[in-house]
């Protein structure tokens, strides 16, 4: 009896669960279709913005579209791309063009999905800029799918299309295409093959005053040289080319980072540190976490080479804590002047340092570790023998310690004297730093930075054209006009009185 009553209860309880699961699946499918519909409508709006920029000759509309590319690339599903391709290439020989080769499993004779067709989209042919933008979206989608063979062919076709056009309205889209063309070659480990092409496009962009194209191409060439550790060629490119001041913040940040790497490799650590800090400030503070991690690693190494110790709060940032772990241990080894720990850090994280392109600079830190250790010894002891110094530094012989101490005294690391006859090093009393020019120089550096920042901010502001002020009347003209209006009103009032 119990089993007979329990069976219908269990059946009744299980039925709503099935309904809920079916409803949730239907809701998910509906939400997916809605997202695809919104994505197609958004990219259509981008095409309208590009057409508007071409007609009005105002490039800021295209710039607005390109700024939303990181958001758009996450919405490039197969249905979205296929729907846009059906609209852009509805019939004729263009329907069998190169673009369809990069849309997988979407037959050329297929119809557009229901709800995604815009009747007004087939009335007029699209502009060349819209075609290049759609081709760029296909390339970005192939890169996200890691389909390098198709991405390589797509990139080559896109470059052929860009080079064959001589339209100034295409410059901003072409600049973005150059970046992704270089990215495809980098993923294929074939950057050297496109170097001459990038140089030729840089000459063309310079002659046409294409500032965004110049900035992108200079950065691509610098990345190309630095990928193969060609620092001399990169330095020559920087000296012989002019990076445009009107370039976007992202391109400026990239250029400053590459410039910092070049200067650090050429032992110009102060200049390198200045460029890298500016790159961090120009980079997006919320997005571009990978770029900030890369720059911050190099900043830490350069600061250590300058003899400074980075603040602990740098390593505590949530987005940087994990990636800066090896550099935190490196900083501790340098701060304590511990050669043994420095060697352990190199042994444990050497491969990661090589991937970060900081291993060569970190090798130079060994001298800084020794200098830090000698400075600590000089502060702790007023008199110490070379044998004790060799034992503390882990050196093989007292002669090596004596040589290192002599070099440190000559470089100004410590203020001491070395007495070989009596066999000890005597440290002099420390001087007051405020009696030197160092505080004045540091204050001057900060004031100069503030003034430069103010000047750059003023230059970046947009002002109305000078002709705008001519249309506005001055205060004196306004008073004269008001006086004339008052006189005219009085005359009209007197005439009315005369009529009565």
UniProtKB/Swiss-Prot annotation:
Q: Where is the composition biased (Basic and acidic residues)?
A: 468-484
Bridged cysteine pairs (disulfide): none
Which Gene Ontology molecular function entries are recorded, alphabetically?
Answer: enzyme regulator activity
The record's PROSITE patterns line, in alphabetical order, gives: PCI
Name the GO terms of the biological process aspect: regulation of protein catabolic process; ubiquitin-dependent protein catabolic process
The entry's keywords: Proteasome
Recorded GO CC terms: proteasome regulatory particle, lid subcomplex
**How would you summarize the oligomeric state and partners of this protein?**
The 26S proteasome is composed of a core protease, known as the 20S proteasome, capped at one or both ends by the 19S regulatory complex (RC). The RC is composed of at least 18 different subunits in two subcomplexes, the base and the lid, which form the portions proximal and distal to the 20S proteolytic core, respectively.
Q: Which family does it belong to?
A: Belongs to the proteasome subunit S3 family.
Name of this protein: Probable 26S proteasome non-ATPase regulatory subunit 3
- The organism encoding this protein is Anopheles stephensi (Indo-Pakistan malaria mosquito)
């Amino acid at each position: 009896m119990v089993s007979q009553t329990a069976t219908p209860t269990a059946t009744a309880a299980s039925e709503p669960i099935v309904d809920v699961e079916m409803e949730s699946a239907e809701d998910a499918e509906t939400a997916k279709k809605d997202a695809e519909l919104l994505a197609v409508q958004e990219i259509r709006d981008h095409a309208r913005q590009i057409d508007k920029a071409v007609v009005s000759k105002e490039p800021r509309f295209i710039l607005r579209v390109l700024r939303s590319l990181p958001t758009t690339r996450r919405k490039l599903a197969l249905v979205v791309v296929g729907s846009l391709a059906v609209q852009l290439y509805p019939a004729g020989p263009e329907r069998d063009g190169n673009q369809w080769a990069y849309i997988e499993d979407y037959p050329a004779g297929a119809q557009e999905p229901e709800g995604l067709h815009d009747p007004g989209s087939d009335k007029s042919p699209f502009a060349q800029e819209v075609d290049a933008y759609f081709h760029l979206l296909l390339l970005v989608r192939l890169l996200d799918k890691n389909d390098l063979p198709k991405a390589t062919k797509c990139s080559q076709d896109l470059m052929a299309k860009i080079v064959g056009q001589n339209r100034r309205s295409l410059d901003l889209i072409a600049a973005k295409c150059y970046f992704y063309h270089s990215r495809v070659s980098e993923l294929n480990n074939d950057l050297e093959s496109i170097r001459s092409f990038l140089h030729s496009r840089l000459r063309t962009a310079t002659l046409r005053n294409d500032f965004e194209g110049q900035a992108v191409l200079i950065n691509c060439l610098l990345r190309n040289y630095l990928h193969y550790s060609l620092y001399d060629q990169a330095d020559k490119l920087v000296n012989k080319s002019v990076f445009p001041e009107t370039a976007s913040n992202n391109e400026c940040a990239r250029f400053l980072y590459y410039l910092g790497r070049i200067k650090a490799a050429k032992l110009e650590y102060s200049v390198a540190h200045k460029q890298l800090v500016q790159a961090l400030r120009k980079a997006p503070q919320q997005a571009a976490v990978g770029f900030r991690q890369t720059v911050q690693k190099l900043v830490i190494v350069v600061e250590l080479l300058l003899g400074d110790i980075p603040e602990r709060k740098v390593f505590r940032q949530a987005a940087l804590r994990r990636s800066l772990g090896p550099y935190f241990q490196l900083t501790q080894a340098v701060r304590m002047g511990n050669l043994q720990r420095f060697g352990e850090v190199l042994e444990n994280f050497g491969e990661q340092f090589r991937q970060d392109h900081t291993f060569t600079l970190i090798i130079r830190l060994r001298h800084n570790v020794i200098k830090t250790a000698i400075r600590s010894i000089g502060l702790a002891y007023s008199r110490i023998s070379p044998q004790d110094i060799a034992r503390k530094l882990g050196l093989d012989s007292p002669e090596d310690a004596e040589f290192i101490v002599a070099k440190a005294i000559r470089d100004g690391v410590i203020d001491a004297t070395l007495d070989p006859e009596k066999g000890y090093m005597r440290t002099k009393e420390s001087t007051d730093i405020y009696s030197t020019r160092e505080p004045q120089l540091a204050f001057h550096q900060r004031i100069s930075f503030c003034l430069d920042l103010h000047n750059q901010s003023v230059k970046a502001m947009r002002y109305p054209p000078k002709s705008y002020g001519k249309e506005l009347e001055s205060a004196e003209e306004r008073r004269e006009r008001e006086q004339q209006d008052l006189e005219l009103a009085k005359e009209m009032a007197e005439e009315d009185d005369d009529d009565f």
